[in-house]
């Protein structure tokens, strides 16, 4: 598979990036996040945050990447 094709597939998989606030910490690295739009989503921690032991607590501001397929689920990619 060429670089161009891989890049196109990676761009297609990217979700919508929004900011929000962690409302509740759930088991297994899951969090309930209230987005700036007012919507509440269920989000899990991205692998890089988990590997680097970035702590996320209720009340933290975070960037969430929403899945284009299911807008009620997302991935926390950055803690602000």
Curated annotation (Swiss-Prot):
Function description: One of the essential components for the initiation of protein synthesis. Stabilizes the binding of IF-2 and IF-3 on the 30S subunit to which N-formylmethionyl-tRNA(fMet) subsequently binds. Helps modulate mRNA selection, yielding the 30S pre-initiation complex (PIC). Upon addition of the 50S ribosomal subunit IF-1, IF-2 and IF-3 are released leaving the mature 70S translation initiation complex.
SUPFAM superfamilies the record matches: Nucleic acid-binding proteins (SSF50249)
CDD domains the UniProt entry points to: S1_IF1 (cd04451)
GO cellular component: cytosol
GO MF terms held by the record: ribosome binding; rRNA binding; translation initiation factor activity
Swiss-Prot/TrEMBL keywords: Cytoplasm, Initiation factor, Protein biosynthesis, RNA-binding, rRNA-binding
Gene that this sequence comes from: infA
Protein name as it appears in the record: Translation initiation factor IF-1
Subunit structure: Component of the 30S ribosomal translation pre-initiation complex which assembles on the 30S ribosome in the order IF-2 and IF-3, IF-1 and N-formylmethionyl-tRNA(fMet); mRNA recruitment can occur at any time during PIC assembly.
Source species, domain of life: Bacteria
């Amino acid at each position: 598979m060429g670089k161009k094709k891989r890049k196109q597939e990676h761009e297609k998989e990217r979700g919508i990036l929004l900011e929000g606030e962690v409302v509740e910490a759930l088991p297994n690295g899951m969090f309930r996040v209230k987005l700036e739009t007012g919507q509440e989503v269920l989000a899990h921690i991205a692998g890089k945050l988990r590997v680097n032991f970035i702590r996320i607590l209720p009340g933290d501001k975070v960037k969430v990447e929403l899945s284009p397929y299911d807008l009620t689920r997302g991935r926390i990619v950055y803690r602000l």
